[in-house]
Amino acid sequence: MTRRNVVAASAACLFAILLSAAACAAAIDPAASSIGFTLKTRWGRTLVGDFPKYDGEIALLPDGRHQVRLQLSARDVEIEGNQTFTRLTRGEGFFDAGRFPRVDYVSDPYPAELTRAGGRLGGLLTIRGVQRREVFVIRPAVCERPGVECDVVASGSVDRNHYGVDRWGFALSSRVVFTLRVRTVAGEGA
């Protein structure tokens, strides 16, 4: 085999690998999924937040494990029924969406069985440019193909102070509980 043929064959193999990797990611369906959070005030009121705009996928890695990759729009975050809290949440004292327009999460690689059986899923959460390891708890699935036939449901509690979201301590709890209900577009499970 000539050097030219080896280079051409290598390029063809690399192209095939890249194509198969792209085909192995299941996009998160924004019409059938929801990503939000709750936050308690010091007076006992629960504020319910929603990320109506986000991008995400569940990638199938070469070793057969999966990985969640999410980008949530902090610019579009909403607090249900309260425009004042919506404005404050997007502002400098909370997400500071003008400077940090996204909240990112990349999970650790995990076996597909985790979404069926439930369990803990670690990963890197980035808020306001601060990246920290956090753990979310996946609930056991109520169907055979989670993400396709039923939601994958996960939740996790983070301390907002760890991300520089430390204003309004007199009025807001430091704990923020994120909740995700996820379905995929591609028809591939999570």
Provide a role label for each language-model segment.
Residues 10-21:
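Bacterial N-terminal signal peptides
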Residues 3-7:
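N-terminal export leaders
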Residues 24-190:
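Low-complexity, acidic/polar, glycine-enriched regions of mature
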